[in-house]
UniProtKB/Swiss-Prot annotation:
Record's bilayer topology term: Single-pass membrane protein
Name this polypeptide is given: Oxidoreductase AOL_s00215g277
Enzyme class: oxidoreductase
A Pfam family per the record: Cupin_2
Keyword tRNA-binding belongs to the record: no
Entry's Gene Ontology cellular component terms: membrane
Gene source species: Arthrobotrys oligospora (strain ATCC 24927 / CBS 115.81 / DSM 1491)
Molecular function GO labels: oxidoreductase activity
The entry's keywords: Membrane, Oxidoreductase, Transmembrane, Transmembrane helix
Job of this protein: Oxidoreductase; part of the gene cluster that mediates the biosynthesis of sesquiterpenyl epoxy-cyclohexenoids (SECs) such as anthrobotrisins and arthrosporols, metabolites that possess a novel hybrid carbon skeleton consisting of a polyketide-derived epoxycyclohexenol combined with a terpenoid-derived monocyclic sesquiterpenol substructure (PKS-PTS hybrid). The SEC pathway plays an important role for fungal soil colonization via decreasing fungal nematode-capturing ability.
Gene Ontology BP terms: terpenoid biosynthetic process
Effect of gene knockout: Abolishes the production of arthrobotrisins A to D. Shows significantly increased ammonia levels in fungal mycelia.
Length: 253
């Protein structure tokens, strides 16, 4: 295990295409009282999505203790698992509100008639510096894409580091007592304390559109302020082409 090194530059891109076109996310202006709003398209029949479905892998189950999350399906079907029960959302459901606390995860419903599920996702604002917001999603999906394209498994410490910075916490299995307690402290200890000491950071200039705001967050943290290097985004951007792909390494003479 080692801290992440981003392989693609997507900061400032809108819309953002992930997983070879399986996901397309457009950042929109959020309404009052919400900290982000994403228009998301998932191609459930894309070969990357089908491969995940075949493997049985699903997004990590987690919970948010301080924010409401909102889902609104525009077309297709979206599966949202809440406290280990799967719910299939459709346009007829309107906007669905997930209160703080439940263990949950979501994915495009497999086997549906439509190739694509289109939905809006947003969350309430939060007085905390670290919260579920655009910076979290930009980095989380950037990291997932890197892992998928390289065919490697996610690093648990890196995942916890990013989730803790998004005020989100991994959910232990259903049979673990005091799931919120253990999930919270597992994420904090691995992601913040151990991760920060080992050089893991929650936000990266390659993926974060508002890098200054991310630096403000990290600068407010005793263990993560060392990562708040504001000029770093201009430096790393020179290593990528206009499409965000890495430039060929220069040969030494």
């Amino acid at each position: 295990m080692a801290p992440c090194i981003p392989k693609k530059y997507t900061a400032g891109q809108n819309p953002v295409t992930k997983f070879e076109g399986a996901f397309v996310v457009t950042k929109m202006d959020p309404p009052e009282g919400r900290c982000f709003l994403f228009h998301t398209v998932i191609n459930v029949n894309h070969h990357r999505v089908k491969a995940l479905e075949k493997s049985g892998k699903k997004p990590p189950k987690h919970f948010h203790p301080n924010q409401y999350e909102y889902f609104k399906v525009i077309s297709g079907q979206l599966t949202v698992e809440i406290n280990d029960v799967e719910h299939i959302l459709t346009p007829e459901d309107g906007e669905v509100t997930l209160e703080p606390g439940p263990h949950h995860r979501l994915w495009g419903t497999p086997g549906q008639k439509n190739d694509k599920v289109v939905f809006l996702i947003s969350a309430s604002t939060n007085a905390r510096s670290y919260q579920l917001d655009q910076a979290f999603f930009e980095n989380w999906y950037g990291y997932q894409e890197d892992m998928m394209m390289r065919g490697t498994a996610p690093d648990l410490i890196q995942v916890c580091c990013m989730f803790e910075a998004g005020d989100s916490y991994l959910s232990p299995p259903w049979w673990v007592p005091f799931r919120h307690f253990f999930g919270y402290w597992l994420t904090v200890i691995l992601g913040y304390y151990i991760g920060s000491l080992l050089g893991y950071q929650p936000f990266f200039p390659e993926w974060t559109t508002d890098w200054d705001a991310a630096c403000d967050k990290m600068a407010s943290s005793l263990l993560q302020k060392k990562f708040a290097i504001r000029e770093l985004q201009d430096v790393v951007k020179k290593n990528f082409d206009a499409n965000g792909d890495p430039l060929p390494a220069k040969k030494l003479l």
